[in-house]
Structure formats: structure tokens, C-alpha cells
């Protein structure tokens, strides 16, 4: 964006939410690089020491925490190669779980990102090798559920 000063005042969220307004030569770079920065910032911001209970706000939409964990794990394991599984708020205001490849970000599709689960190999390979499933199971124990709940609820506040 060095040579596109008209976008210098745009936030990363705005850039990703309005990719269609960015000319083709820049769009792919913004999607890939911006998507990666956004996803990883959120991923690390939503981690905490083990021990927190699942966010009560999630339980308003899922019968049990177990169902939410299952949906996220299924999406993460179903992502071939690199990418993220996401808890999102869909454009109609309902929560959903989705998987997106590479650096693709829910903002580009009109969804509000709540919680990313990074399934790029760099997220788990040193400790878990090819055991993505074990990484996912343990990941659920280091989520800052209070922050996730705040993100989820902030979507619905004016």
C-alpha cells in the first residue's frame, strides 16, 4: 500500500471488509498479508493460561460446550493444508463455524470473526508433529473465554 496513499487511513478491518473496493493489483496482497496479520493477531490475543470455563455467550447458541468443540474440531480437521477454523457471526446475526484456507479471512465474506483456530503447521508441528487432532484438543484449554465472550457480545451491542 506504499504507492496507494488513498488506503493509508483505512484500518485493517476496513481493508479486509471492503476488498472489492481495492484494485486488482493490490487486492491479493491485502487479502493474503492483511488476512494473515488479522488472523494471527486475533489468534494470539485470545489465548490465556489454562483453566477458564467456556464463554457463557457461546452456550447461548450451542446446547453444550461439547457440541461447539466438535463443530470447531470438525472444521479444523476438514481444512486440507493450511488455514483456520473460525467461530463467526454470519451476516444474518447467527453464529457459525467455518474453515477457510490459507490467509483467507471471514471479513472478506461479510462474516464477523470471533475466534480463529490456526491449523497452519507452524501452529502445532514442533510440539504435535502430524497430530493435528491432539493440538486441537489441547488448544481448547488455552482460550481466553472471557475475551471470546466479549467479542461475541460486542457484535450485538450498538
Predicted feature descriptions by range:
Residues 1-158:
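Feature for soluble, non-membrane regions of globular proteins
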Amino acid at each position: 500500500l506504499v504507492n496507494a496513499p488513498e488506503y493509508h487511513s483505512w484500518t485493517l478491518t476496513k481493508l479486509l471488509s471492503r476488498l472489492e473496493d481495492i484494485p486488482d493489483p493490490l487486492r491479493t496482497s491485502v487479502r493474503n498479508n492483511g488476512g494473515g496479520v488479522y488472523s494471527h493477531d486475533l489468534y494470539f490475543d485470545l489465548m490465556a493460561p489454562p483453566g477458564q470455563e467456556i464463554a457463557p455467550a457461546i452456550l447461548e447458541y450451542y446446547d453444550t460446550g461439547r457440541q461447539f468443540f466438535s463443530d470447531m474440531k470438525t472444521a479444523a480437521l476438514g481444512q486440507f493444508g493450511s488455514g483456520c477454523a473460525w467461530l463467526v457471526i454470519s451476516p444474518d446475526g447467527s453464529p457459525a463455524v467455518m474453515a477457510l484456507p490459507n490467509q483467507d479471512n471471514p471479513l472478506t465474506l461479510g462474516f464477523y470473526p470471533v475466534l480463529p483456530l490456526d491449523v497452519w503447521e507452524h501452529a502445532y508441528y514442533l510440539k504435535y508433529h502430524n497430530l493435528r487432532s491432539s493440538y486441537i484438543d489441547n488448544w481448547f484449554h488455552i482460550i481466553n473465554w472471557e475475551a471470546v465472550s466479549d467479542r461475541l457480545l460486542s457484535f450485538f451491542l450498538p
